[in-house]
């Protein structure tokens, strides 16, 4: 990617993200963090709150840190979300080895164009964003730094320290991300040891960082409650209990790992097969193509046996990678495919699981598919630009009315509280299916007279609401 193209891509993406993140309203647990943020007046207050949550209910230290400091600080929240998403696009492209403007734009569109259920729990919802986007960003950044170190066969102390810090910090968010990072760090350490006949200091430092971060996360006393009936997240005791949980979770697991994600479910086979079409096909080429196409048809049109269809899809994907790619692209694609499975596997044994938990797997599958991208022609670049513009316009058509309703709500609350009203009527959000927990009583965490809950919020249809 030429410097001028790179600058245009980044500035365009930054502008689009800035507009959308400004339009996204607070929803669900964001209101709790909004009220909490107003009560944090010093670093000591913040540290005490983080330690208290680590000991009791929520050990995700860095996820909580970002969510708490952005509570009641809309400009900071807007800047953080815009910058972190832009960095995610940038380092995802770097990890995938993408150097063209069209490739960058296509990957950015893929990362943003999530299935609706995942999208509304990741981008519009601040609490979800700060727990799920940063760890993926940190992992991809670490992968890029580590790949450079292995290529140069040098492990300067600053680079090793950076990898140690990235490995440690990336673990202080979501649990399945943490497990995936530990497995990835261990694999890379062993692989470089076998390949180079000696351990790589860079890989060892990253692995050590992931172990230390995971130790801090999982030694939280809050995890002692996962077998209790009233815990927010639960894990059955014993092997039989775990297997029963895995069986119950299997439909959700297969749906949000692959079957319910058309961008990766269809995109990977399309890119892989198109990359091979110009060459002479052999019998061995037909096998992965048949597995990929057959499993896609199965997932789309056959309601039963979805788990088996997903299994065949991954078999076809690995077959395509090892048959149709070579060198660094093959290694990257296989690593990303395995990473997607490793990130999803722990979710089989915990309840409840939400679509947002599969964000890291979704991104890794996109990066695997990106290894099949051909060098773009001009017409392809224009098509990708038109696609990105269309998705941006669609988002505006959904979230601009939501933004206007959020402003109406805020004005109505301000007027009602000035009059001392104990019950406040508010209009429902339009397009509420694109928001997480949109019309919620959790507003009372941010709006109250003396104690949270002394105001009741009543939601009414837009046509029945009047100021």
List each language-model region with its residue ranges.
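Intrinsically disordered, polar/acidic, low-complexity terminal segments
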Residues: 3-62, 67-90, 95-103, 199, ...
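Alpha-helical transmembrane segments
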Residues: 5-19, 103-110, 162-167, 205-212, ...
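Transmembrane catalytic cores of multi-pass membrane glycosyltransferases
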Residues: 20-76, 126, 175-323, 348-351, ...
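Transmembrane alpha-helical segments
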Residues: 84-95, 138-150, 182-190, 265-270, ...
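Membrane-interface alpha helices of multi-pass inner-membrane proteins
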Residues: 158-186
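Signature aromatic-anchored transmembrane alpha helix within multi-pass, membrane-resident enzymes
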Residues: 159, 284-293, 325-341, 373-395
């Amino acid at each position: 990617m030429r410097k001028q193209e790179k600058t245009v891509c980044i500035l365009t993406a930054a502008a689009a993200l800035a507009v959308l993140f400004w339009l996204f309203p607070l929803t669900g647990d964001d209101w709790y963090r909004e009220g909490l943020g107003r009560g944090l007046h010093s670093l000591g207050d913040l540290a005490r709150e983080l330690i208290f949550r680590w000991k009791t209910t929520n050990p995700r230290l860095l996820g909580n840190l970002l969510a708490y400091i952005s509570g009641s600080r809309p400009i900071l929240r807007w800047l953080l979300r815009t910058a972190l998403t832009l960095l995610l696009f940038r380092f995802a492209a770097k990890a995938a080895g993408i150097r063209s403007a069209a490739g960058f734009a296509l990957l950015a569109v893929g990362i943003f164009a999530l299935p609706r259920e995942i999208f509304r729990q990741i981008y519009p919802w601040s609490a979800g964003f700060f727990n799920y986007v940063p760890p993926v960003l940190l992992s991809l950044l670490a992968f890029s730094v580590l790949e450079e170190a292995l290529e140069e066969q040098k492990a300067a102390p600053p680079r090793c320290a950076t990898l140690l810090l990235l490995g440690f910090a990336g673990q202080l968010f979501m649990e399945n991300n943490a497990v995936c990072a530990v497995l990835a760090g261990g694999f890379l350490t062993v692989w470089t040891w076998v390949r180079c006949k000696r351990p790589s200091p860079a890989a060892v430092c990253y692995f050590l960082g992931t172990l230390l971060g995971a130790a801090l996360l999982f030694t939280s006393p809050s995890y002692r409650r996962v077998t209790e009936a009233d815990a927010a997240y639960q894990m059955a005791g014993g092997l039989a209990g775990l297997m029963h949980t895995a069986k119950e979770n299997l439909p959700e697991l297969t749906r949000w790992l692959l079957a319910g994600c058309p961008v990766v479910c269809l995109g990977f086979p399309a890119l892989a097969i198109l990359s091979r079409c110009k060459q002479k096909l052999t019998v061995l080429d037909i096998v992965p193509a048949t597995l990929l196409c057959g499993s896609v048809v199965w997932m789309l049109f056959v309601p039963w046996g979805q788990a088996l269809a997903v299994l065949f899809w991954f078999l076809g994907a690995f077959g395509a990678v090892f048959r149709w790619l070579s060198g660094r692209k093959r290694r990257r694609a296989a690593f990303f495919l395995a990473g997607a499975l490793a990130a999803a596997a722990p979710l089989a044994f915990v309840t409840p699981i939400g679509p947002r938990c599969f964000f890291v797997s979704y991104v890794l599958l996109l990066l695997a598919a990106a290894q099949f991208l051909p060098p773009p022609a001009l017409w392809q670049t224009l098509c990708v630009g038109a696609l990105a513009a269309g998705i941006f316009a669609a988002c505006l058509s959904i979230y601009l009315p939501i933004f206007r309703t959020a402003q109406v709500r805020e004005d109505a609350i301000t007027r009602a509280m000035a009059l001392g009203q104990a019950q406040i009527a508010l209009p429902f959000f339009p397009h509420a299916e694109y928001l997480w927990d949109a019309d919620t009583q959790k507003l009372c965490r941010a709006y109250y007279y003396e104690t949270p809950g002394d105001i009741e919020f009543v939601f009414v249809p837009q046509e029945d609401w009047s100021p």
